[in-house]
Amino acid sequence: VTVRGRRVELDAVFVLHHRPWRDTSRMLDVFTREHGRLMLFARGVRGPRSRSASLLQPFVPLLASWTGSGETAQLTQVEAAPGGSVVGLPAGALLSGWYLNELLLKLVLRADPQPAVFDLYARTLDRLRDGQAVAAVLRGFERDLLVQLGFGLELGREAQGGAPLQADRYYHFHPSLGFVATSDDAEAAYAGRSLLALAEDDLQEDAVLEDARRLMRTALDDALEGRELRTRSVAR
């Protein structure tokens, strides 16, 4: 990536959302590796002679250049990232991809560089392209996103005293506190073995996946602070 005054050259970029702007242009909500989320104006890309329209689609890894900053930045160049897919996601993974995008749009602040989150997103798209189990892929993304954005999801220890979680015990989760041991018949308790499996990305068993789904929903609800996710139904 090169930064020259108010010009940025060839940063890694994904388009999260786009909408028409005037007759032949688009407004792009993009996630860049080194500059975070930005709004870019892409002039003329909807015109009949545009060569970049097919590239400026969600889920396609790109290299982009732009001038300006804030709400006035303008796209000046775009090309496919070396070695990246130029066809987005397969049809069966599209809804999951939109769910990832909505999480980023809701939780990642504008102009806040998050290179680790960018890399996590890119890896997750690759896993979806490879046809890996969708539920396990989404739970892993949710877990790592919350950790990277500082929401304090500590899967390995109890909130009070920091004792390691035990596989044969059960726990309640309090978003502002963490995990608290409880009895095995407590309502909405999480199995310790499920929490440890989630921490190790071992998401093959149905019981583990169900506990992981419930936990991630609770943790994300807290992070979203009441904002709704339109795509949440695909994350079950």
Describe the role of every protein-language-model region.
Residues 1-236:
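Non-catalytic alpha-helical scaffolds and adjoining flexible linkers that form interface surfaces
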